[in-house]
């Protein structure tokens, strides 16, 4: 409902001084250009220290980029109050918040206001945008460095589950595993129960069926829908094979980290070390290159249905003929996605 939507717009202005269009645009650009030089706040590019301690400054600098606002700010509110109050007087919301705190709580209200003013720069701009792309665990092998800082998203609205968010950016629910908790989803469900919100989309749930004898288009659709789950399972397969087949003298921890990344994310010297290690293990080389071939299937958006089916079927046949039991089992797993 418009009233609920407007409440959150008002709350954003009152507690942060941020403009809805700028917030949405910078967030969208971050997802579109993640871990590249165009990412407004990537610790992989700018360094963790820079994003952690200067995240708010990075946000403000990008908010002044008109190209970003025009390209990524589409579909955001553009009514009279947005133009004439929230945007024109963006800094006055936090002053009103200070006044309200002092009126309601007396002198202690100044301390409450100070905590409110520090909360977003430290937790969202610093911790989520910094640590959330540097340290933590990953449920999904998506193309960026996003991590889940903690399995319980309580203090920062569920954004602690940042890898889940990047894997399924349009999902209203950030928790994915049974042991994870997203307090933002808890609030959304309350609003939905009261008829004040509607959940449009959540992350797809993996379902299984007996392995199809041949790949069909429904197989391709299921694999592409669950591609992050597919690549996470493939990463586990690679980790097991690393322990068995990695040549002596090669750093297992370092190699595991590099193999988690796509070739585009690797430096030239890292690529060279990987190739040197793979030259000494035919099985590891096969598993590594088969992963690249698998990702190419859904990266080529111009392929027809028939081409997609053929490419996935060819991959499965190649895996089963490789003589590597783990690849044969993975082919069966792919054909079992429902």
Name each region found by the language model:
Residues 45-47, 145, 181, 332-335:
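An alpha-helix initiation/capping motif
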Residues 73-80, 139-161, 165-168:
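Active-site-proximal inter-transmembrane loops
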Residues 310-338:
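Amphipathic alpha-helical
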Residues 1-127, 171-314:
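Non-catalytic, topology-defining segments of multipass membrane proteins
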Residues 30, 154-155, 191, 334:
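A generic structural signal for nonpolar/aromatic side chains embedded in well-ordered alpha-helices
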Residues 158-161, 165, 190-197, 318, ...:
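Hydrophobic alpha-helical segments
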Residues 133:
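Metallocofactor- and cofactor-centric catalytic cores in central/energy metabolism, strongly enriched
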